[in-house]
């Protein structure tokens, strides 16, 4: 990890209420949002308030992991109605489109609130999958970001994607 990126991540963690803990069962938004993570995912950031955020590092066993950060975040923001939810999603998508080397990917046609794209972080191509739900007065964002190519191979990427989909299936109910 280059020094600048290291300092940015360190500062974000310190400002965000740094928490390092093994993740399993997670409850957010005063208990109205629940999900579980694989036990080897490490909670690296927790922000309480509005929005409420949890970020988990997904271990990458390869040498390329020293310069990348595979992660999954869940953000919960209070919204009063469907229009506010749509505005929240639109703002997040607009922000994603500003990332360096942004390229839209192929989302499943059955999921209108799912967005797949690639972009660069510190010169490394990343694949992002973002999903959104409106539930009980909250906009919920699940954002899964991993290097597009890891020396850990396709099996690791498939395991990462499976963990992300597992959280999505829980949040979507």
Question: What are these language model-derived features?
Answer:
Residues 47-129, 134, 139, 148:
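Conserved polar/disulfide-associated segments of primarily extracytoplasmic proteins
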Residues 18-23:
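Sec/Tat signal peptide C-region and signal peptidase I cleavage site
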Residues 24-53:
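N-terminal "mature-domain start" segment
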Residues 32, 79, 83, 151-158:
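Soluble non-cytosolic domains of exported or imported proteins
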Residues 1-8:
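Bacterial N-terminal signal peptides that target proteins for export
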Residues 37, 84-92, 156-163:
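Stable alpha-helical elements in mature extracytoplasmic
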Residues 142-173:
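Surface-exposed amphipathic alpha-helical segments
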Residues 8-17:
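Bacterial N-terminal signal peptides
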């Amino acid at each position: 990890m280059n020094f600048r990126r290291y300092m940015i991540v360190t500062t974000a963690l310190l400002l965000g209420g740094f928490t390092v803990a093994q993740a399993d069962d997670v409850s957010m938004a005063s208990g109205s949002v629940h999900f579980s993570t694989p036990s080897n995912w490490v909670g690296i950031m927790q922000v309480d308030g509005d929005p409420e955020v949890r970020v988990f590092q997904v271990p990458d066993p390869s040498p390329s992991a020293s310069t990348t950060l595979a992660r999954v975040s869940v953000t919960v923001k209070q919204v009063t109605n469907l229009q506010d939810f749509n505005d929240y999603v639109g703002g997040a998508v607009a922000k994603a489109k500003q990332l360096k080397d942004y390229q839209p990917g192929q989302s499943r046609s059955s999921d209108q609130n799912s967005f797949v794209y690639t972009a660069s972080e510190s010169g490394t191509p990343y694949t992002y999958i973002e999903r959104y739900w409106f539930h009980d007065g909250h906009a919920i964002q699940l954002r899964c970001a991993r290097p597009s190519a890891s020396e850990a191979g396709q099996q690791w990427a498939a395991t990462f994607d499976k963990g992300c989909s597992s959280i999505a299936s829980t949040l979507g109910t």
